[in-house]
Amino acid sequence: MTRLTSFFLFFFVSLMATTAMAEDKASKALALTPPMGWNTWNKFGCNVSEGLVKGAADAMVASGMKDAGYQYIVIDDCWQVKRDEKGNIVPYPDRFPNGIKAVADYVHSKGLKFGIYSDAGTKTCGGKPGGLGHEYQDAIDYAAWGVDYLKYDWCNTLPGQDARASYQNIRQALDAAGRPIVLSICEWGGRQPWLWGEEVGGNLWRTTEDIQDRWAGKKEWSPGHCCSNGMLDIVDENEPLYSHAGPGHWNDPDMLEVGNGGMTNAEYRTHFSLWAIMAAPLMAGNDIRSMNPDIREILINKEVIAVDQDALGQQGRRVWKDGDLEVWSKQLQDGGRAVVLLNRGASPQAVTATWEQVGYPGHVSAGVRDLWGHKDLGKFTGKFSAPVESHGVVVVTIKP
């Protein structure tokens, strides 16, 4: 090998390594707090359209959700009808008559960000064209359309297809397209993405099967096809993974069901509070165009949202449990703690959090603030107790 050849080989390898490092750094600079937004799937399934998405963008602004921190409008499955003769992905012309870019432009005009859905297999979960073999081609389209967020599913993959390699491939394709795009890994937790998702450039990864709009209990989607999860089942699967979350890489216990009608308002407050203390992405899944004031007030509670979005990026965890009663704690950037008192039971009960449980010396005097009541409760020493309604929570911050 000549010196000149050796030089060019060294230069090429160095350039590729530098590019890979730059792309890795770029992806990790995204989603430094858990993404907040709205997704079509939980409420509308495959019934997506330009009008629906534009209406949701309007509602996100008018309802106060944008001011509360929500920013992504995400079209989930079933927007794509086919690939053309060149292999380009094509949206349904009757549902999106002006194309996807026009929808993205409208979302951006509202000061929001735009997200879209695809799949690592040959077809999406809804049977539409998947991304396998078209990763770079699709990424170029996404960048040209103005996509800011990609949810990438795991249906209809090939026998033996490697999830880690597949998600690394789509991340590299997105980076090569030149637009910063948050990557949401959606393979339902079966291959433990919390162990490799950050390394391959994912910004969030699903940790469980799909959520269903109910308090608790697993349910088959169809005979032999397991399973969807009640809200508490999701919580119990996601909680032990707290050490794997942080700025730019989040455990995703699935989208919110708040407002879809399967739970009480108390249960929806619990749902929202537990997602917040787990530093989970807050992706609303209801019809935000027509939600009632009670649901709106749950979704735009800025004090609870601040717990979720705290810059320290620590996922909270369960620190005490006795039967149906639990205490959850999350360290905050200012040195305080966010604490959830949870009552899973059928009747009201008092729940107590001790300072030792949340990481403070027992003799310390600390101020306590009620985040759903929006009021300071005073100074307490050693512990804080409160009555908690059935299936409810009390959420407080504690700070010496």
Feature locations, PLM:
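C-terminal beta-strand-rich structural cap/linker in extracellular carbohydrate-active enzymes
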Residues: 378-400
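Carbohydrate-binding surface patches
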Residues: 275-278, 283-285, 321-360, 391
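Aromatic-lined carbohydrate-binding/catalytic grooves of carbohydrate-active enzymes
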Residues: 56, 60-159
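Structural recognition of the beta-strand scaffold that forms the well-ordered cores
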Residues: 34-40, 69-76, 113-118, 148-153, ...
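Bacterial N-terminal signal peptides
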Residues: 6-17
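Boundary at the C-terminal end of the N-terminal hydrophobic targeting segment
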Residues: 20-24
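Catalytic cores of secreted or luminal carbohydrate-active enzymes
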Residues: 270-319
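Glycan-recognition surfaces
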Residues: 134-137, 182-286
